[in-house]
């Protein structure tokens, strides 16, 4: 193997190992993974956003869980619901990126992977309850706001929909 080709292969392997996404059912998550998920969600939703509301809502067992790791550190997460579980439509939510890992595109990766996962399962349309300040972010992925803004845990939210063919 040529030295240049070998170097390119090594760089590709390092890049591939750096970020990893995994989707698991609730029952397939280890205790350590569940602890890391709840810790990340609490860190952002309760502490950072100063939202003193219960994060654990009894819906995690109904969801599939998308975990994004960088160098074996859980740095981003979302949970994905098939239709007729959280909403009539398929959905994903509790989308979170660790503060120290923002600006790397991980939020976009979570949304793209969630859409891809639901699309592969023929789940259409997708409805999300987006924090209103993130409307442009979700619109960049094709989501369209519908209805009036509402409060969820005292934070302004907007229902947004994505339909694909």
Where are these regions (language model features)?
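Short amphipathic alpha-helix that is part of the acyltransferase structural core
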Residues: 12-65, 69-74
